Amino acid sequence: MWFKNLLVYRLTQDVPFDAEALETALATKPARACASQEVATYGFVAPFGKGEDAPLVHISQDFLLIAARKEERILPGSVVRDALKEKVDEIEAEQMRKVYKKERDQLKDEIIQAFLPRAFIRRSATFAAIAPKQGLILVNASSPKRAEDLLSTLREVIGSLPVRPLTVKVSPSATMTDWVKTQKAADNFFVLDECELRDTHEDGGIVRCKRQDLTSDEIQLHLNTGKVVTQLSLAWQDKLSFVLDDKLVVKRLKFEDLLQDQAEQDGGDEALGQLDASFTLMMLTFGEFLPELFDALGGEEIPQGI
């Protein structure tokens, strides 16, 4: 269980996350299949294991792991548009009259309802780790919308969830730009070979570099003409690499072989043991990595009134 992306949320009040109570709460909204006329469903699933007896909360040391699954019927817009056009053309030809917006919208709804039972189904799972002692919730997602879906559903079942996206005092873009300009990152961080540069003007250009020497004159020229770094590939110690963006989203996390080998050794022969060991080691690594990342970005910003 290694997260590939990371969105970090700060609990703004102490929340007594009791594993047994949380298990009971999550069980009130289990994931389920879409009914024939449902567009989507959302609910909680066991993060590890299958079957009705698999727990919805996985506990390891002081960390809790939960997962939610979305099931949605996929109706391509082009299919609906083509069917609607065909129906409208048929009515206008047969009845010699114009089909206006209100009727067109009603026809569209009828077409969607007729197509839904035959639509393809897509399932996607989102994992979140709760670290009560650190006051953090870490979501394995690069999309804030996907993370908010999980957090709002968690809030729904437990009654209250005072949480906000973690922010830092210095703009990530300003820090990353400085690191590339000076060719030196903060202690324990190393600039790799990928970045995105954007002009600060609204309609300005974008330059994306991969497998590029970011110390080159070409990159420095872009920075000297006013572009800023909005994404940057980095490594931390010898433990992980990632891409950081200007919204403080950590993407394309890759844990180095050293950690993965250690988890494999700690986990034993059982699949569940392997998953538990990798989750625990990941969270302990985050416990070192995240404070250093936030410090490198000027420290955590605490909004007034919180």
From Swiss-Prot:
Keywords: Cytoplasm, DNA recombination. It is found in: Cytoplasm, Nucleoid. GO terms for biological process: DNA recombination; regulation of DNA recombination. GO terms for cellular component: bacterial nucleoid; cytoplasm. It holds the Pfam family RdgC. GO terms for molecular function: double-stranded DNA binding. It comes from the Bacteria. NCBIfam families: PRK00321.1-2, PRK00321.1-3, PRK00321.1-5. HAMAP family: RdgC. Belongs to the RdgC family. PANTHER family: RECOMBINATION-ASSOCIATED PROTEIN RDGC. May be involved in recombination. This is Recombination-associated protein RdgC. It comes from Pseudomonas savastanoi pv. phaseolicola (strain 1448A / Race 6) (Pseudomonas syringae pv. phaseolicola (strain 1448A / Race 6)). The gene is rdgC.
